[in-house]
């Protein structure tokens, strides 16, 4: 882990938001 939990979470959210989907929302849609 080279990132703090906050930094990593923000990095993931930023990537997902760029595609127009949030991690939780995407999981709910695919579930």
From Swiss-Prot:
<comment type="subunit">
    <text>Heterohexamer; disulfide linked. Contains 2 sets of 3 non-identical chains (alpha, beta and gamma). The 2 heterotrimers are in head to head conformation with the N-termini in a small central domain.</text>
</comment>
<feature type="compositionally biased region" description="Basic and acidic residues">
    <location>
        <begin position="18"/>
        <end position="31"/>
    </location>
</feature>
<feature type="compositionally biased region" description="Acidic residues">
    <location>
        <begin position="1"/>
        <end position="10"/>
    </location>
</feature>
<comment type="function">
    <text>Cleaved by the protease thrombin to yield monomers which, together with fibrinogen alpha (FGA) and fibrinogen gamma (FGG), polymerize to form an insoluble fibrin matrix. Fibrin has a major function in hemostasis as one of the primary components of blood clots. In addition, functions during the early stages of wound repair to stabilize the lesion and guide cell migration during re-epithelialization. Was originally thought to be essential for platelet aggregation, based on in vitro studies using anticoagulated blood.</text>
</comment>
<keyword id="KW-0094">Blood coagulation</keyword>
<dbReference type="GO" id="GO:0002250">
    <property type="term" value="P:adaptive immune response"/>
</dbReference>
<keyword id="KW-0391">Immunity</keyword>
<keyword id="KW-0175">Coiled coil</keyword>
<keyword id="KW-0765">Sulfation</keyword>
<feature type="region of interest" description="Disordered">
    <location>
        <begin position="1"/>
        <end position="31"/>
    </location>
</feature>
<keyword id="KW-0399">Innate immunity</keyword>
<protein>
    <recommendedName>
        <fullName>Fibrinogen beta chain</fullName>
    </recommendedName>
</protein>
<feature type="modified residue" description="Sulfotyrosine">
    <location>
        <position position="3"/>
    </location>
</feature>
<feature type="modified residue" description="Sulfotyrosine; partial">
    <location>
        <position position="2"/>
    </location>
</feature>
<dbReference type="GO" id="GO:0005576">
    <property type="term" value="C:extracellular region"/>
</dbReference>
<keyword id="KW-0356">Hemostasis</keyword>
<keyword id="KW-0964">Secreted</keyword>
<keyword id="KW-1064">Adaptive immunity</keyword>
<dbReference type="GO" id="GO:0007596">
    <property type="term" value="P:blood coagulation"/>
</dbReference>
<dbReference type="GO" id="GO:0045087">
    <property type="term" value="P:innate immune response"/>
</dbReference>
<keyword id="KW-1015">Disulfide bond</keyword>
């Amino acid at each position: 882990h080279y990132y703090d939990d906050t930094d990593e979470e923000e990095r993931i959210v930023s990537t997902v938001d760029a595609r127009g989907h949030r991690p939780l929302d995407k999981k709910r849609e695919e579930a």
